[in-house]
Structure formats: C-alpha cells, structure tokens
C-alpha cells in the first residue's frame, strides 16, 4: 500500500492561505485514492481545532519540534523515518533537508528572497542552503500561479518547467449569503450599513498602510481585518473600525456586506483573500501586482499598489456607482467559480502518481 504523509503543521487558526491550502488537500485527496494510506503530520501540541474533522478519516501524527523552530529539521527527519512513507508532501516552504526520501514540495512564492522588507540573513540562508537545494532534488514541484513560477524559478535557481502550476481553489462555503445574514452580522459586530472592508496583516508587503492617508476621507467607514492591534501598528486613527479574526461563516458575511473589499498587498503568490471575496459577491479592488492580475482578472478593479489616491478614487467609484458594484459582484462570483479545491486536489494527486512512477 502506498503511504503518503502530508505536512499539516502550519494549520492552526486563523487560517492563512498556505494553511488553508494544506487543509483543503488533506480533506479532498484521500477520498480520491482509497487504496492508499494518507497520514497528516501535525506539530508537538497535537491536533488543533481546524484539523479535528480529519482525525476520524486519516491518522494524524506529531512532529516533536515546532514548525520552523531550530530543532525542526532533525525532528522532521525523525518523524518521516518512523513513518517510512513512499512520498512526503511539503505543503509549505519547510522542506526536510535531513530526510532523503521521495518529496513533492509546494513553493507558494519567494517573498523572503524577493522583498527587502521580508529578507534577513537567517531567512536568506534558510532558503538558499535548505529550501533551494532540497527542492531541486524533489521528485516534483508545485506552485500556485504563473507569477510564483517566475519568482521561485528566479530566486531559487529552479528551471521553470520543473514547477507545475496548480491554482488554489475556493470552498463552497464562500458564497453569496442572503441579506438577513448580512443584517445579523452587522448588528452583532456593530458595523454600519455601508462600509469598505480591508484585509491583510501588518506585514509590509500586505501594504495596508497605503490606505492610512485616505481612510478618514473615504465615503464610508473603513473596517480593518488584519489581526489584533493592527490599527495602532499601522497608524490608523480611532475612526477606523478594527475586527478581531473572524470564523469563516462571518468572513463570508464581511466580504459580502462590503461596498468594496480592498486588498492592497503588492506581493501575493496567489491572492486567496481576493478570490474568496469575489466568491461571496464582494466587489474587489486589488493591487495590480503579484498574482492578483492572474486571479482577479477583469472581475475586479486593479489599481497601482502604492498610490493612495488611486485607492481613494476606486473606492469612490464603487460607493457612487450601483451598476458598477453589481457588475463586479456578478463578475467576481463567475470568476471565482473557475477555481476549485476539488480540481486542485485531483491535479495534485496526479503529481503524486507521476512522482511515484505510476503515470
């Protein structure tokens, strides 16, 4: 029986894009190949809530060291030597340098090498001495967009033809909710009837600071979803509404209820927040950088990442033009329907089969 270990150590809420990717594959690949054994690798603290649903379906085993900790590499090698899989899928940039077995690695982007603000000596050394050499010896490599294929190829010296592009998906739970749900959400969260949503984090490349000079002059309040303390860290004043991390059900309502969803990140390997917002009918304004042009296409407004006035003008257009909002909402839903986690899982399983010499 073929045994495949899938790395799930980064799945701990609130889910960022890479964690959601790993979780969705672990949900969807095993039923496609019932004759294989799939095992999920989790951290030393055991099974987080987000993985509880998987426990009855696939075994979850612990790695004795934290994700990206100093002891991670020997602990990861020990866990894999104990499991003896035919294949290990490294679903993030944490690859097993001390385990020589068959590897499939997903390299989502190269931001720690490409961006000055994300670069450090430690990260550069890790990517150049660990990630790059081990990835070049992998059985197969996956990335999530044509943008990322170019970035990973350039910064890790990997031939672009070795990187198969398999796009992320969007779960069916991200859908256009009824107005009654939106009214209830606004009431529970103390939100006005009309607002602009901005999503990201305080990381520099998420670029939420571009909205700081214009936030007070927007035609509707700005609601920030970027982690606790982000408002102060990014220099926004008290007029900005800050939300704590939302469960998926309320994230859907946050997207759907916004006059516009502002996603100013200038370096995204894929851009899952923009895709999920479109699936919920939220009109999207995204930076014209990274993978956003690939993912959003003509279904949203793409504006220069670093131009506050361009963001203000786009927001004003959405606020004033009902037809534009309706058009972008419909186009976004249609665009998002082209991205499926089931399709991602099926294509990834084909990568496994080829890596094992089965096709």
What are these regions (language model features)?
Residues 1-359:
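Carbohydrate transferase catalytic cores enriched for Leloir-type hexosyltransferases
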């Amino acid at each position: 029986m073929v045994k495949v270990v899938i790395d799930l150590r980064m799945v701990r809420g609130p889910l960022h894009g890479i964690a959601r990717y790993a979780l969705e594959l672990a949900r969807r690949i095993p039923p496609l190949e019932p004759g294989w054994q799939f095992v999920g690798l989790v951290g030393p603290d055991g099974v987080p809530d987000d993985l509880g649903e998987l426990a009855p379906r696939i075994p979850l085993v612990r790695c004795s060291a934290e994700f990206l900790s100093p002891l991670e590499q020997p602990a990861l090698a020990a866990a894999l030597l104990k499991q003896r899989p035919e294949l290990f899928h490294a679903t993030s940039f944490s690859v097993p340098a001390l385990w020589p077995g068959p590897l499939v690695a997903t390299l989502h982007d190269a931001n720690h090498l490409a961006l000055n603000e994300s670069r450090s000596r430690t990260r550069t050394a890790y990517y150049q001495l660990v990630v790059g050499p081990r990835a070049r010896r992998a059985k197969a490599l996956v990335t999530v967009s044509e943008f990322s294929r170019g970035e990973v190829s350039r910064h890790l010296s990997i031939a672009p033809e070795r990187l198969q592009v398999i796009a992320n998906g969007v779960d069916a739970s991200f859908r256009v909710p009824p107005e009654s749900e939106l009214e209830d959400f606004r009431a529970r969260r103390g939100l006005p009837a009309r607002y602009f949503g901005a999503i990201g984090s305080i990381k520099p490349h998420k670029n939420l600071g571009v909205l700081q000079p214009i936030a007070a002059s927007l035609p509707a309040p700005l609601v920030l979803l970027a982690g606790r303390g982000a408002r102060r860290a990014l220099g926004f004043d008290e007029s900005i509404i800050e939300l704590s991390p939302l469960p998926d059900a309320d994230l859907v309502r946050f997207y759907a209820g916004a006059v516009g969803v502002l996603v100013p990140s200038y370096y995204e390997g894929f851009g899952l927040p923009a895709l999920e917002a479109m699936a919920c009918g939220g009109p999207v304004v995204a930076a014209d950088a990274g993978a956003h042009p690939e993912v959003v296409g003509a279904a949203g407004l793409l504006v220069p990442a670093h131009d506050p006035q361009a963001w203000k003008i786009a927001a004003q257009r959405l606020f004033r033009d009902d037809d534009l909002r309706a058009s972008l909402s419909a186009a976004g839903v249609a665009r998002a329907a082209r991205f499926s986690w089931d399709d991602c899982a099926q294509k990834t399983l084909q990568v496994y089969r080829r890596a094992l010499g089965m096709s």
